[in-house]
Amino acid sequence: MYKIYDDCISKEIADKIEKTLLDRKYLWNYGNHTVHEEVPDPQMFHLLHMFNPIIGMRNGKSIVGEGKTTKSDFFYLVEDLLSEIKKNTDIELDNKVLYRAKSTILFPNAVSQKKESEIHIDFGDNQSTRINILYYANESDGDTILYESDVKTIMKRISPKKGRFVLFSGDIPHCASSPTESYKRVVMNINFGSS
């Protein structure tokens, strides 16, 4: 299950998110690996990227399940975005638990011809009960690709557009593509589970 939403986030909130994520005060962390630290296949390709854990992560790992939650000073961006989603769509989030929210910035890849990251799901257990929201914070290229369960057949390519977001089931394999025409691709990734 996936659904793409356009024109549901007000210009005011979309501009606020973009401006904040691209502000010099918003600190990014270097990410050498897209998904996992160990690379099971030497042919596997990880996009070098920058990220900022907004809630629920420590050292790149979710800590919500440990009974602890960390929130960055930028958690208000998640609250603003979710408020807009609740107000302007029929998406029901009240019975969901927020597991993780992070922002990611990708740059053009000059190292390899490969433009897609590792195909992955965001968490390893109970995927069918989880949902993901991927919000595009700026105008750019660098599609998100959703795959069928065989992890070979493309289900949908989603092009970034400022203010667009895609809601999809946690069991859908997916990957990001680095931009080739734009200087940066900025997203917020929000993961929910059942309460």
Enumerate the predicted regions with their spans:
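Non-heme Fe(II)/2-oxoglutarate
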Residues: M1-D94
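Catalytic core of non-heme Fe(II) oxygenases with the double-stranded beta-helix
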Residues: V64-S195
